[in-house]
Design a protein with these regions (language model features):
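C-terminal and inter-domain tail/linker signature
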Residues: 3-166
Length: 166
């Protein structure tokens, strides 16, 4: 085995160890943050106002770019997420960890041009969001999401996202 192939092999193993250590570190930080964080829900019994329900959705949008906010997103325990019809989120814990570990969200640089509509006509309990994602690669995506956030509990029960790149 040549010196070059040994060096490349060692570099490859070192990079795997570094990635593993980075993920382990993120998990440990997440466990600590999860322990100290509570979902951001107004401190009074419902029904909750449109502004409070909008704030629940804004916390989710914040967590797309700020992993530290992941455990403050007020998900219902059985919350599901769909992207363009494909189920990508299965429960609150999985959604919070996805946001915290930030693997699929790490390309998002900024969430902008946010327009929220609470209870669009004929859709009680829905907060509709339209916004643009700017990525680190320079690609923009237009997103339209419907969040089911009933006034009774102010928790996000489901997210239906439609994403168009370009």
């Amino acid at each position: 085995m040549s010196l070059l192939s040994r060096a490349l092999g060692m570099a490859g193993r070192a990079s795997v160890v570094a990635v593993g250590a980075s993920i382990a570190s993120a998990v440990l930080v997440g466990i600590d943050q999860r322990r100290g964080a509570a979902p951001k829900i107004p401190d009074h019994p419902g029904p909750y106002s449109p502004e409070e329900r909008e704030a629940a959705v804004r916390m989710y949008l914040t967590a797309l770019t700020a992993p530290a906010a992941a455990f403050r997103v007020p998900f219902a325990r059985d919350c599901v997420r769909r992207e363009n019809g494909l189920r990508t989120g299965f429960n609150a814990a999985q959604l919070q960890w996805d946001l915290h570990l930030h693997l699929q969200y790490s390309v998002i640089r900024e969430v902008r041009d946010i327009v929220l509509t609470v209870d669009p006509p004929g859709r009680e309990g829905v907060v509709h969001a339209e916004f643009t994602l700017a990525t680190v690669l320079g690609v923009k995506a237009r997103v339209s999401e419907d969040f089911v956030v009933p006034p009774e509990d102010c928790l996000i029960h489901s997210i239906d996202a439609r994403i168009a790149v370009g």
